[in-house]
A protein has these predicted regions:
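N-terminal beta-strand-loop-alpha-helix module at the start
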Residues: 2-85, 89
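Solvent-exposed alpha-helices and their adjacent loops that cap or buttress functional pockets
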Residues: 14-21, 39-43, 63-64, 85-87, ...
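Short glycine/serine/threonine-rich phosphate/pyrophosphate-binding segments
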Residues: 34-36, 57, 101-107, 134-139
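Long, charge-dense
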Residues: 74, 80-87, 97, 101, ...
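Short phosphate-binding loop-to-helix
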Residues: 90-119
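Anionic-ligand-binding alpha/beta catalytic cores of soluble enzymes and soluble regulatory domains
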Residues: 122-178
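Long, charged alpha-helical interface segments
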Residues: 162, 168-247
């Protein structure tokens, strides 16, 4: 088991905090993120990037007078009228022709290059609209989460939707603050990227005690939040998911 210092997480801290430095937002073209959540995520971010058709979603929910900082992708989904309106209001549009990468990966790479230029290694990027539509899109979002975590282990990437949130926990010890006004009761630890040799938890209804997680063996789905602080120690990267009810 890794012995790194404990990493502290608060997936919905942005609901009660103003925009902070190195807090980026990527917007996807998904109905799983409604206007109230998108607006709160937007307000808490110092940089907003729409992934191709995410520009349509942002435009239709928030209007043309609130442009993102950038639109990134192959631009086969973003409407021409949306791009024109955004460019008129100062948004940078970046066409990236790479059929081996999806638009979320392109947007995350764009955010990462911006951090690199500023010497930032521990930023936070939140992805709005990662759930609720096509299952292959959800898996692509999780794949992007794993790739991002492997490339930038000190940074954090959180997937957000109106009904769920998820983030990758790297090998080591973690403490997660539970915001009971919006999170739970259900949660899970999912070994998406491969077997997790050992996981130990505190603060859940059914805690794990050094058990192995793997598809076809044990998956900690439909667990329940028990305490206001959840402690997790994992030997390998594992996906943390939590139910969300924004009211």
């Amino acid at each position: 088991m890794a012995t790194n210092a404990v990493r502290h997480h608060d997936l919905h801290a942005f609901l009660q905090q103003p925009a902070a430095a190195n807090q980026s937002l990527v917007v996807l073209n998904s109905e799983s993120c409604g206007a109230p959540l998108l607006e709160k995520l937007w307000d808490a971010s110092d940089y907003v990037c729409c992934a191709d058709g995410g520009a349509n979603r942002a435009h239709d929910l928030l209007g043309a007078d609130r442009p993102p900082d950038a639109v990134v992708g192959d631009l086969d989904s973003a409407r021409a009228d949306v791009l024109a309106a955004y460019e008129e209001n100062g948004c940078a549009v970046h066409r990236v022709e790479d059929q081996d990468a999806n638009d979320l990966s392109k947007a995350l790479a764009h955010v990462g290059r911006r951090w690199d230029a500023a010497g930032v290694s521990d930023g936070v990027v939140r992805v709005a609209g990662a759930f609720g539509d096509r299952f292959d899109h959800e898996l692509a979002a999780v794949d992007a989460l794993y790739r991002f975590g492997a490339q930038r282990p000190r940074a954090r990437c959180v997937l957000h939707g109106d009904r769920a949130a998820a983030m990758l926990l790297g090998a080591g010890a973690h403490e997660i603050r539970v915001r009971r006004d919006v999170e739970g009761p259900h949660c899970g630890l999912i070994p998406v990227g491969g077997a997790v040799r050992r996981v130990t938890t505190q603060g859940l209804a059914w805690n794990l005690c050094g058990q192995r997680l793997a598809f076809g063996e044990l998956v900690s789905s439909s667990n329940l939040l028990q305490d206001d602080l959840v402690s997790i120690e994992t030997s390998d990267p594992v996906l943390w998911t939590v139910e969300v009810e924004l009211g």
